[in-house]
Amino acid sequence: MSILEGKKVIHFIGCGGSGMFPIIQILHGKGYTITGSDVNEGDIINYERNMGIKVTLPHAAEAVEGADLVVYSAAIFKDNCELARAKELGIPCVERSIMLGEVCRLFPKSICVSGT
């Protein structure tokens, strides 16, 4: 069973990161309602806002309210206020790498490119 099953609203903690942005773009394009938060303004945040995504700066516990699923960056500390609030509310929380795998399963074929 996919962690996306039955989910409509997905909140991304650390949405300004280069690892989160492609996942956000794909899920937004697939019709999911996306919200996000980060600590700093930046080009990615501006682009997400231009896509119609609600982005909260800085992190705020109430930003996760209404989400069906929370995705967090590896850069997010375990005591992050949004992550803690999501757990209090019983909202499923997954790390970005798990969501990347889920997104790959949405397509019949995937290609991975890596390097240093």
PLM regions: where:
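N-terminal leader/targeting and accessory segments in enzymes
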Residues: 1-99
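Walker A (P-loop) phosphate-binding motif
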Residues: 12, 97, 101-116
